[in-house]
A protein has these predicted regions:
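Solvent-exposed loop/turn segments at secondary-structure junctions
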Residues: 8-11, 91-96, 130-131
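Extended amphipathic secondary-structure runs
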Residues: 50, 55-72, 92, 171-189
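Long, amphipathic alpha-helical surface segments
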Residues: 98-189
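Exposed alpha-helical structural elements
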Residues: 11, 15, 33, 97, ...
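Surface-exposed interaction patches
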Residues: 63, 68, 77-111
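Acidic, aromatic-lined catalytic clefts of primarily extracellular/periplasmic carbohydrate-active enzymes
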Residues: 1-85
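Residue-identity detector for glutamine
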Residues: 3-4, 17, 50, 92, ...
């Protein structure tokens, strides 16, 4: 936000930066209150700032990195569904982490070429939500039992509590893939 020519974007960036450093560096009450105030003042404008920030900081860099390093890959060859999957994974894992997730998913399929888009979506979410039994903190409880993940951990989220991992598991292995597949069915090529 601070690098933008638009004065509104810069003012949002400055306010958030000031809130972050107010009372010592870190997120907390000052930051949360400023975030809420920005949303209350202009929710549409603030949403636009957030989307542009994610696009410039995460989505465009992951697409550029994939297109530069995966021969023949172009995000423009795919529907909004797969592009949204790349957006989501880049925002979650960061550019470097998302690149690893996506290229591992492609490798698990034997490459991305000639793969149905639905398979690419499923493979990316499967890798992002990959399970491991080699972690100190694991998922447990009735919901974990129901999904067959009790005693397991998410490979990319082992530093999180079992409860957080279970919530992320449901998002990565149930909710987001289903929404992406529905979007593909509705808007796909």
């Amino acid at each position: 936000c601070l690098q933008q020519d638009d004065t509104y974007y810069r003012s949002v960036g400055e306010r958030l930066q000031d809130a972050y450093y107010s009372g010592g560096a870190g997120y907390g009450t000052n930051f949360d209150n400023t975030w809420r105030a920005l949303n209350n003042e202009d929710s549409a404008g603030f949403l636009r700032v957030q989307r542009n920030y994610v696009r410039l900081s995460y989505y465009e860099p992951i697409v550029a990195k994939l297109e530069a390093n995966v021969p023949g890959f172009s995000a423009d060859d795919y529907s909004i569904a797969l592009r949204n999957v790349l957006w989501s994974r880049a925002a979650q894992h960061g550019t470097g982490g998302a690149y690893s997730v996506v290229t591992r998913a492609f490798a698990a399929l034997g490459g991305f070429k000639n793969q149905p888009e639905a398979e690419l979506i499923d493979a990316i979410y499967a890798e992002s939500g990959r399970l491991t039994t080699d972690a100190a903190t694991t998922m447990s409880g009735a919901t974990a039992e129901r999904y067959g993940v009790s005693g397991k951990a998410l490979a990319y989220y082992t530093g999180c509590s079992g409860e957080v991992q279970l919530g992320v598991y449901l998002r990565l292995r149930v909710n987001e893939p289903a929404k992406a597949q529905a979007m593909l069915a509705q808007y796909g090529y």
